[in-house]
C-alpha cells in the first residue's frame, strides 16, 4: 500500500551521505528497515505512513567521486514532539546496502507558519482591494453628504423660479452664478447668499435686475470665454459691484472650498475689470443702466449736507470700528443702543422698536439698509463704504470713513 496523501504540519529535511553508489530505493529501504522496531510499533515509519501520520518520503539524489549524496524530505502530520522523535530516528541510519552512511537533519520546517505567512500576505492584498474598490473614502462620503444637504437647501426664487441659496433675501450682498450646479456647490461650502441666472439665452431674468438695485452684487463666472459672455450680458442691464472668476479652464461647479474662497477673496471691482479689458485691447462695453435705475451720484449724496457734530472723536471711533464688521446703533442723544454684527443689521432695523438716530458700521451700506433705516427715521449713517444707491432721503446723511478722516 502506498503512502496516503496528507496535510502536513511539519517538513523534516535531512541530508544523507553514502560511501558508495546507491539509488533512491536503497536509501528509502534503509530508512524503513533500519528504524523498524527501534521505538515500538507506534513510531514505526511504515505504520505511520500507512496511517497517514507521515507522507511520501522524497529523495533527491546525486553521485560524485563514487559517493552518493541525497536530500531527504519527510512530511509529518504528527505533533512537534513526535516529529522531532522521527527526525532523530532517521539520524540513526548507519548503512545503505553494503556501504557506510551518515544522516544529518538540516531543519524541521513548520509548514503551518509558512501557510500563516501566506494567509497574512493574501489578507493584506484583500484589505487593500477592499479599501480601493469596495469601501468608499470618508472624504467622498462627507462630500456626498454635504452635496445632498446643499441640494435640500436650494430654493426657487422669484417668478422665474431661479435656483438660489436660502439667504438671498436676508443678506445685503449676493453672489450671482450661471447655473443650478454652481449654486449647489457654493451652498455646499457655506455660501448661502447665491443665486443662478439659469442661462442668458432668453435674457437676464428680471429678478436678478431687481436684486441688483438693492444689494451688493458679486458675479462669479466660469474661467472660460463663456463666463465672459455671461458677464457682458449681465452688465448691460444690472448693477454689478464685484467680479470673481474661477481658475482658467475651470467651472464654478467644479471648484473646491479652497478654490472658491481664493476666487472670492481675489474679486475685483467693475472699474478694475473694465480697466483690465481696456489694457488687454478689448472693447469692454460699459453697462448702460436704465434712467430710473441710475444710482444717485454718491458725491451729491455725501457732500451736500454739512458734517454733523459728533459728541466723541469720530476718527478714534472709526479706528475702533475698523476690522470688526460690526455696527453701532445710537439714539438722538448719541447714547449707544446696541452693537451687533453688520449681517444682523437688516433684521434689527426690521424688528426693533427702539428710536434710532445714527448708525456707524464697518461694512457696506446698501440700498436695502438705507430703505430700512429711513423707515426707522435714521438721520446719520457713517459707513466703511457704500454700494449702489438709487434713493437716499433728503433728511439722511451718509458719510464714509474716508470722508470723515479727510475732514479731520
UniProtKB/Swiss-Prot annotation:
Residues given in the record as Mg(2+) 2 binding sites: 222, 224
Assigned EC number: 2.7.7.101
Catalyzed reactions per annotation: ssDNA + n NTP = ssDNA/pppN(pN)n-1 hybrid + (n-1) diphosphate
Keywords: DNA replication, DNA-directed RNA polymerase, Exosome, Magnesium, Metal-binding, Nucleotidyltransferase, Primosome, Transcription, Transferase
Cofactor: binding details: Binds two Mg(2+) per subunit.
Gene3D superfamilies per UniProt: 3.40.1360.10
One BP term from GO: DNA replication, synthesis of primer
Region span, Disordered: 279-304
Pfam families named in the record: Toprim_4
Domain (Toprim): residue spans on this chain: 172-248
Matches recorded under InterPro entries: DnaG_primase, Primase_DnaG_arc, TOPRIM_DnaG/twinkle, TOPRIM_dom
Cofactor: Mg(2+)
Molecular function (Gene Ontology), one example: metal ion binding
GO CC terms, sorted: cytoplasm; DNA-directed RNA polymerase complex; exosome (RNase complex); primosome complex
Binding site for Mg(2+) 1: 178, 222
Function: RNA polymerase that catalyzes the synthesis of short RNA molecules used as primers for DNA polymerase during DNA replication. Also part of the exosome, which is a complex involved in RNA degradation. Acts as a poly(A)-binding protein that enhances the interaction between heteromeric, adenine-rich transcripts and the exosome.
Protein family per UniProt: Belongs to the archaeal DnaG primase family.
UniProt cross-references to HAMAP family, sorted A to Z: DNA_primase_DnaG_arc
Quaternary assembly: Forms a ternary complex with MCM helicase and DNA. Component of the archaeal exosome complex.
UniProt xrefs under NCBIfam families: PRK04031.1-1
Official protein name in the record: DNA primase DnaG
